[in-house]
């Protein structure tokens, strides 16, 4: 353990943590325009067709994001809201799209975990 004099001579270094979602530039979300919507296959033990899209953000950066949930309404030139969060079995996909905002509609048939997929609460009419 250093003495007080040693700390005065050479203070402790502050360890800076690097952001994992660098394209957002310290913002929680960013708006973007879809350039290409396509499917890709995941890494080795998994097998599927994952829906992804290449997006140009409003700050000029280009990213690849994951479209979560079943079915989507994205086309070229659609507006999307991008948040951080990588997809473990898709290399290079470090971002998710927020469902239920702009042109990416909510998952319509969702009953559980609705907040993650932009689905409003359905209340049956009182008779």
Swiss-Prot record:
A GO biological process held by the record: translation
A GO MF label: structural constituent of ribosome
Superkingdom of origin organism: Eukaryota
GO (cellular component) term, any one: small ribosomal subunit
KW Hydrolase (keyword) present: no
Subcellular location, record wording: Mitochondrion
CDD domains, A to Z: Ribosomal_S12
Alphabetized UniProt keyword annotations: Mitochondrion, Ribonucleoprotein, Ribosomal protein
Predominant location: mitochondrion
Job of this protein: Protein S12 is involved in the translation initiation step.
Protein family according to the UniProt entry: Belongs to the universal ribosomal protein uS12 family.
Cross-referenced PANTHER family: 30S RIBOSOMAL PROTEIN S12 FAMILY MEMBER (PTHR11652)
Name of the featured protein: Small ribosomal subunit protein uS12m
Annotated organism of origin: Chondrus crispus (Carrageen Irish moss)
